[in-house]
């Protein structure tokens, strides 16, 4: 039975393509962006999250799993190296302070979930978006899900970082109406410094994708001081100006996700960086407009 590792499903989403959409967030990503606002999506494995502000120190989790401990100050700790993400503690918690990130989902259940919102798609031109993480790391499941959705004439979109083999794109091309393609930085060295990988494969895939004729919306997470410099913006403009099937560029201002990192006992890499201001985001949008590049809000 074909299954996918799904982190979350968001209904009536408005930022993941045209109209109201059902967005499937796939778990697992090849990049480790230092600004990532979904750190729970990075690992392909299920993970246990602890929302410490909800914890009431009832210790029912400890009754079902000895990997939950409390130090002398009463701090709730988890022996994560030994955790198998079985979920027993999640079920035992009376206040939902524990969450399991990632679950195996059958193709049939995923399709049924998407079809439950079909009336909204019909009303406003919405559809389904596969996001992540990186959905094309699970290209077989992604292609199968998109194929079923197209049988119901549902608009489909794939949000990708592009850091996957071209063969993964080929599997979903026939059943994808729109690609949302993330660009982080035009220079490979800077890209590698902040994401863990260079950008050669991403740009190669973007060029190949453009030649297929599929519509592409490029998305740029705007990180102050990293890719907001004049040099970086000029590099972006050069890349975008050469795309024949670019519909628009969307600027995504950096913001913090501290509670998500805390839930996983992770340190937020850019915790000391100020969030992107509205003024900077608008300056960057104006730059692209000045260079005759369509900007989506």
Description of each model-found segment:
Residues 17-18, 25, 42-43, 47-52, ...:
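N-terminal-biased segments
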Residues 50-52, 192-198, 265-273:
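Short glycine-enriched, charge-decorated loop/helix-capping segments at active-site entrances
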Residues 34-41, 60-78, 88-104:
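Iron-sulfur cluster-binding cysteine motifs and their immediate structural context
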Residues 7-60, 76-85:
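N-terminal pre-triad scaffold of radical SAM enzymes
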Residues 5-7, 73, 159-163:
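Short gly/ser/thr-rich secondary-structure transition/capping motifs
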Residues 1-18, 222-297:
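Auxiliary Fe-S-binding modules of radical SAM enzymes
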Residues 108-263:
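Conserved AdoMet/S-adenosylmethionine-binding subsite of the radical SAM
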């Amino acid at each position: 039975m074909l299954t996918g590792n799904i982190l979350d499903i968001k209904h009536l989403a408005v930022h993941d393509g045209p109209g109201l959409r059902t967005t499937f967030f796939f778990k697992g990503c090849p990049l480790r962006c230092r600004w990532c606002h979904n750190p729970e999506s990075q690992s392909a494995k299920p993970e246990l999250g602890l929302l410490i502000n909800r914890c009431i120190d009832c210790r029912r989790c400890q009754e079902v799993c000895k990997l939950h401990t409390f130090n002398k100050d009463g701090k709730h700790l988890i022996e994560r190296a030994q955790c198998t993400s079985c979920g027993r503690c999640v079920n035992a918690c009376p206040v939902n302070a524990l969450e399991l990130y990632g679950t195996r989902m059958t193709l049939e259940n995923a399709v049924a979930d998407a079809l439950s919102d079909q009336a909204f798609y019909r009303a406003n031109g919405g559809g389904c978006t596969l996001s992540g993480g990186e959905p094309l790391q699970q290209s077989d499941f992604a292609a199968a899900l998109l194929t079923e959705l197209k049988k119901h004439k549902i608009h489909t979109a794939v949000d990708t970082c592009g850091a996957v083999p071209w063969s993964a794109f080929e599997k979903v091309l026939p059943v994808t109406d729109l690609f949302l393609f993330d660009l982080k930085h035009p220079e490979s060295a800077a890209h590698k410094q902040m994401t863990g990988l260079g950008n050669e494969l991403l740009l190669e895939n973007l060029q190949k994708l453009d030649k297929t004729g599929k519509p592409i919306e490029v998305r740029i997470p705007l990180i102050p001081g990293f890719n907001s410099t004049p040099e970086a913006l000029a590099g972006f403009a050069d890349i975008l100006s050469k795309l024949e099937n670019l519909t628009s560029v969307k600027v995504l201002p950096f913001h913090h996700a501290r509670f998500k990192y805390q839930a996983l006992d992770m340190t937020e890499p850019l915790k000391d960086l100020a969030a992107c201001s509205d003024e900077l985001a608008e300056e960057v949008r104006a730059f692209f407009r000045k260079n005759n590049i369509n900007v989506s809000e």
